[in-house]
Regions:
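Conserved ABC ATPase signature
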Residues: 134-138
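A short, proline-enriched helix->beta-strand linker immediately N-terminal to the Walker B motif
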Residues: 153-157
Length: 202
């Protein structure tokens, strides 16, 4: 077992039409690291995160998550991952608590165990008072929190986030950043994209 949570070797991504988003990048992230991919729009950050999270198909190259080659055993790799993309990934008409509870069930967490886990997660993210609200009524910042709750409910070893604080006001951004640092301090490796230099420098 290596010391790395993520190993990328010569990763390339070319989209239909010939747009080359990634031109052979290589990267290693150690277990327990908090790693930020910094760059302007169009730099390939979202493509990289999407490929790591198995949401985007790579053109070539190798991706290993805790030594698991995603080409050979993507199912096991997914169990180790929590993914927060930029796009909303839940029904806007479902209740907040139901969205996270359903996600727990997807990972095989028994209802008796899931119930207190969901309550704890929603409280930590400031969503407990909104647990019976439909997701469509939430602000953009709270929808982002809900996506993080979904991604963390199965306690992944690696959390990846694509612009988690984009479009969020300064106060909420600070709260989310503090929460992510707390998660990292408890042992979860975190990789995120950002175009905020001050965040990357933390």
């Amino acid at each position: 077992m290596s010391e790395f949570a993520l190993q990328i070797d010569n990763l390339r991504k070319t989209y239909k039409g010939g747009t080359e988003a990634l031109k052979g990048i290589s990267l290693k992230v150690k277990k327990g690291d908090f790693y930020a991919l910094l760059g302007p729009n169009g730099a390939g950050k979202s493509s990289t995160i999407g490929i790591i999270g198995t949401l985007v198909t790579k053109t070539s190259g190798q991706v290993k998550i805790f030594d698991i080659d995603t080409d050979k055993d993507v199912a096991t790799a997914k169990l180790l991952l929590g993914v927060v993309s930029q796009e909303i990934n839940f029904s806007q008409f479902e209740k907040v608590i139901d969205i996270v509870t359903t996600q727990a069930g997807f990972y095989g967490i028994k209802k008796s165990i899931a119930k207190p886990k969901v309550e704890t997660m929603l409280k930590r993210l400031g969503l407990w008072d909104k647990r019976n609200d439909q997701a469509r009524t939430l602000s953009g910042g709270y929808k982002r929190r809900l996506m993080i709750a979904k991604a963390l409910i199965h306690e992944p070893k690696l959390l990846i986030l694509d612009e988690p604080t984009a479009g969020v006001d300064i106060e909420l951004r600070r709260e989310m950043w503090d929460f992510l640092k707390e998660i990292n301090a408890n042992g979860t490796t975190i990789i995120l994209t950002t175009h905020y230099l001050e965040e990357a420098e933390q």
